[in-house]
């Protein structure tokens, strides 16, 4: 989990890696890029959680559609935070769900527990695993 720094909106909120898709970029490429930018991590495996979150941006009158991914990383990888965050911590899924500020991220953790709790996606591996 990452804690938002005092220099961005929602300071102090705990969240998962997230971001936006840049022009000409695929959602998968954006997920990999954001993971690297926000944590310094490289995904060993990436899963499509088969979930699409939507929310309304009232300030710009836009609807955002967000595909949700889960990354498996090397447990020995070192965290390198961007200026967007000033803290991080590893938590068990149940505890992380209590700490995350955004309800959509809590819902995604339920999918992670169900789909990847055994270390892989089981019979869905060939469908959900991106790489």
Model-predicted regions and their roles:
Residues 1-15:
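N-terminal strand-loop-strand
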Residues 5-6, 72-77, 93-95:
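Short loop segments at secondary-structure junctions
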Residues 16-49:
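The catalytic Nudix box helix
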Residues 68, 79-112:
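NUDIX/MutT-family hydrolases
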